[in-house]
């Protein structure tokens, strides 16, 4: 209770730096680069490490592994009882298409078939996402703190845990597609970690059956769920998600946002708005899930993979655990 933490800096791993520094070239040959033996070996080791992390809340007594050096890090500084502390927490590196590297590309003969997913579960793979509750962290000098499922720089006891799902569809799935990252996936993941949201806000542009919306909710979600069957807007009025966030969240809250509305111009405008100098919303977000729509056609004027790397890096540099 006597500690005060602030985000300090984002430091990409050498693996991420390798991709980012070569992205002008790599963005047109992602699959062939990922298939190189040096990339395959790192990919498998990092993927298996994330899968093991995902299964439980991170234990500060867990054994460090050399593969952890391939992860990027969010760095924090804290003051506890007038003493300064430095902390770092792992996050998945931005590599390949900024998603599970063993999806979206042809199968690599040297990779065991049991490491591949199929169909929608490959397209919507969540195996490469390292959320904060599962993420390894270190505090220097060591500090005996009671970690109540979330690191102290992300959440203060007594504050809120908020999920905002922009493009939510129904709670369980959109068109019965249970492979998607939807509200239920977040609910299940956090419930497994004994973390309960205090508030869930769901935006959906498509007109949904009101009765079904509420019937699909688990009993413990009903009282904390706000459903807004109106599309989000970039104008800073009542349907702007950043304005809503500013109204309901405080810096000590743990805020998770998913943005997936399948309207690239609006998504891009909202992201640009979030990065605006005068927009305080970016300092309220802890984890943000977003898949930027891009083109691999050299002649296209659409955004390229390089634009995704730049966007994700900027947001991570503001302290947001940005996931693709």
Task: Label the model's feature ranges.
Residues 1-244, 294:
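SAM cofactor-binding core of SAM-dependent methyltransferases
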Residues 149-153, 227-278:
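Short internal loop-to-helix segment that lines adenine-nucleotide cofactor pockets
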Residues 157-159, 196, 250-253, 284:
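Residue-level preference for short coil/turn positions at secondary-structure junctions
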Residues 162, 254-256, 287:
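Structural motif
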Residues 200-204, 257-259, 288-291:
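Extended hydrophobic secondary-structure segments that form protein cores and membrane-embedded regions
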Residues 219-222, 247, 276-278, 309:
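Short, low-complexity, polar/charged sequence segments that are solvent-exposed and flexible
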Residues 263-324:
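Conserved acidic-Pro-Pro-aromatic motif
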């Amino acid at each position: 209770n006597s500690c005060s933490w602030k985000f300090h800096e984002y430091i990409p791993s050498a693996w991420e730096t390798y991709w980012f520094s070569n992205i002008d070239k790599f963005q047109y040959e992602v699959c062939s680069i990922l298939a190189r033996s040096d990339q395959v070996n790192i990919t498998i080791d990092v993927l298996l490490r994330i899968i093991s992390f995902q299964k439980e809340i991170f234990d500060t007594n867990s054994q460090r592994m050399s593969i952890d050096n391939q992860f990027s890090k969010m760095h924090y500084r804290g003051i506890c009882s007038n003493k300064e502390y430095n902390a770092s927490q792992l996050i998945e590196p931005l590599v390949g298409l900024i998603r599970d590297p063993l999806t979206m590309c042809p199968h690599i003969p040297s990779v065991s078939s049991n490491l591949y997913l199929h169909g929608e579960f490959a397209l919507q793979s969540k195996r490469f996402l390292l959320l904060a509750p599962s993420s390894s962290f270190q505090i220097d000098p060591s500090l005996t703190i009671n970690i109540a499922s979330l690191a102290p720089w992300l959440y203060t006891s007594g504050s809120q845990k908020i999920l905002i799902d922009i493009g939510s569809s129904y709670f369980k799935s959109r068109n019965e597609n249970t492979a998607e990252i939807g509200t239920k996936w977040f609910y299940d993941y956090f419930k497994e970690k004994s973390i309960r949201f205090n508030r869930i806000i769901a935006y959906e542009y498509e007109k949904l059956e009101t009765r079904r919306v509420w019937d699909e909710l688990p009993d413990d979600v009903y009282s904390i769920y706000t459903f807004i069957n109106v599309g989000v807007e970039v104008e800073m009025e009542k349907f702007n998600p950043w304005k809503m966030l500013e109204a309901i969240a405080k810096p000590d809250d743990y805020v998770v946002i998913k943005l997936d509305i399948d309207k690239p111009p609006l998504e891009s405008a909202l992201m640009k708005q979030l990065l605006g100098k005068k927009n305080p919303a970016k300092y309220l977000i802890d984890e943000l899930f977003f898949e930027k729509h891009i083109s691999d056609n050299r002649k296209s004027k659409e955004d390229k993979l390089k634009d995704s790397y730049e966007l994700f890096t900027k947001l991570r540099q503001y302290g947001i655990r940005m996931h693709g």
